[in-house]
C-alpha cells in the first residue's frame, strides 16, 4: 500500500509540474526535488518494466504514437491521427509535423519505424501478436504495419504496455549497447517537455526543461490521463534515490 501511495504522489507531482494553468506559472519553483524509492536498471523503456522508470519518463521525457486517457481510451500523441482496417490487420499512422527530439532533430517516419521495430524485438508479447510483420515507412510522416491476421489489441499495447512503445531518434537505436542490450543513458532522447540530463547511479536522476517541446492538445483543458497539453513550468526535476521509507517521509514533511 505504501509503495502504491508513493507512486501516486510521484504521478501527482509530475502533473503539477506540467499542467498548471499558465496564469500561475510565475509561482513555480525552478527545481522540484522528488524522492524515488528505487532506480531503473536502465531507463530504457523498451526493455525496462520498472514502475520507477515509467513514472519518471513516460509522458515527460519519452512519448508514444498513441497514449491513454484517464478512462483507458486511446488517443494520438506523436501521431495526429491513425487508420485501422475493419479486420484490425492494417494500421496506418500519420505523424505530427515539427516535433523535435531533444538532440534538435525533427522526428520522421524513419525514427518511428526504427523505434517500434526495436520495441517489437524487446517485447515478446507484441512480437508474437504481429508475427514476422514489421512497421514500414510510407513517407516522411506516415508509418504502416500490415498483418495477415487480426491484431485487435495492438493499439492497446502501443498505448499502454509496461514495456512502453516510446519513440527514440534513429541514433539512439543505433547506439544500443551490444553487451547489455540497453539504450545508453546518454542516448535516452525523447520528444517530451523534459530532457534526460544526468543519471548519477544510486544517487539521483536529473530532468531539465526542453524549450523546443512541441505541445499538443488544448492549453485551456487539464491533462486527461497521459494525454493532453503539457508545458514544463518548472525548469528542473531532480529525482533522489532514497530507498528508506522513513527518510522519504521525513523529507516530504520537512519540505526538502
Give short role names for the model-derived ranges.
Residues 28-39, 80, 90-93, 112-115, ...:
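Short, well-ordered beta-strand elements
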Residues 10-17:
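Bacterial N-terminal signal peptides
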Residues 80-125, 138, 144, 248-253:
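Aromatic- and charge-enriched surface segment that lines or borders ligand/interaction sites
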Residues 35-86, 117, 189:
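N-terminal lobe/hinge region of extracytoplasmic solute-binding protein
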Residues 83, 127-175, 193-200:
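Surface-exposed binding/hinge segments that line
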Residues 70-73, 161-240, 246-247:
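Gly/Pro-rich hinge or "lid" segments in bacterial periplasmic/extracellular proteins
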